[in-house]
Amino acid sequence: MAGSQIKIPLPKPPDSDSQRLNAFPIIMAQEGKGRLLRQIRLRKILSGDPSDQQITFVNTYGFIRATPETSEFISESSPQKVTPVVTACMLSFGAGPVLEDPQHMLKALDQTDIRVRKTASDKEQILFEINRIPNLFRHHQISADHLIQASSDKYVKSPAKLIAGVNYIYCVTFLSVTVCSASLKFRVARPLLAARSRLVRAVQMEVLLRVTCKKDSQMAKSMLNDPEGEGCIASVWFHLCNLCKGRNKLRSYDENYFASKCRKMNLTVSIGDMWGPTILVHAGGHIPTTAKPFFNSRGWVCHPIHQSSPSLAKTLWSSGCEIKAASAILQGSDYASLAKTDDIIYSKIKVDKDAANYKGVSWSPFRKSASMSNL
């Protein structure tokens, strides 16, 4: 079995708004009991290259409700029927051109008609039927998708509450808009992330997030206590890349060798809201040949948290967080090698001071630009 871990400590990067994502505040409509105001939050994450085209990622948070039943006769004075909330939900509208008017975006949500159905294959799934979206988002990715199929545990807070025989509708309440450089839009293909080989060593990334929550809250029971007393600590792992196994028998492939590789890559980590809460990694230096498929031509890669830890991602829908630290871990790629070797840890990963905070929904924007009733 593997022995103890070898760790290379590093001072924590200075605190900054770039290391956090804040939650949407709870704001109730004055004229309606129990109604939340629609809100929008805006943020910019740019690559630093002035020639890089800007795009917007639109991500939505809201609630699934049963579709209201209609009566035989309806008059103009009939009150609008609103069914109780069943559970919370997230759905990404994807990338598209830059959008300018926040107030217009909120008003346009009234034109949205998205139905929700539950199904199953080898596991439970959710099917979003896109009947109508606002014309404002016609150039975003969602406009090309009439049906969106997804794992229920990644996009629905409590999928067990959705039952057969009921028609459901998704009501958008919170709109998260991230203006970013087009070069940031890169994810590694899942088959490449899942592949393991005895010919390479795997480089994993651990990101420690300080989640905003009370010590006695239910979510705190599934996380570590924060020694600084500012919340709770959650660890999330991603497969970052592979490194070719060195065959020079006269060379020692230890923590010094690994630290040299990571130092030359000049890794920086940040957080944003793109496909939901997302970890962004940038390699600003030399990328080894075996690692190049895991980054785009400008050294960027995005890792949506819901792909690695759906439960943590759903926690961040309603809680803000801050990147506390990040480390790269060298392991054997195939399971036989992994079981027989120590983890070598490189903790000198930079945290981008301009993009290391996540402001979730406490249900608080990066910046609250406008709000209106969720009719």
UniProtKB/Swiss-Prot annotation:
Localization (cell): Virion
Pfam family name, one: Matrix_Paramyxo_N
Keyword Cell membrane carried by entry: no
Taxonomic source organism: Mumps virus genotype N (strain L-Zagreb vaccine)
Protein name per Swiss-Prot or TrEMBL: Matrix protein
A single GO cellular-component term on record: virion component
Major site of localization recorded for this protein: virion
UniProt entry keywords in alphabetical sequence: Viral matrix protein, Virion
Sample GO molecular function, one term: structural constituent of virion
Coiled coil: none
InterPro entries, A to Z: Matrix_C (IPR042539), Matrix_N (IPR042540), Matrix_Paramyxo_C (IPR055413), Matrix_Paramyxo_N (IPR000982)
Family: Belongs to the morbillivirus/respirovirus/rubulavirus M protein family.
Keyword presence, Zinc: no
Role, per record: The M protein has a crucial role in virus assembly and interacts with the RNP complex as well as with the viral membrane.
GO BP term (any one): virion assembly
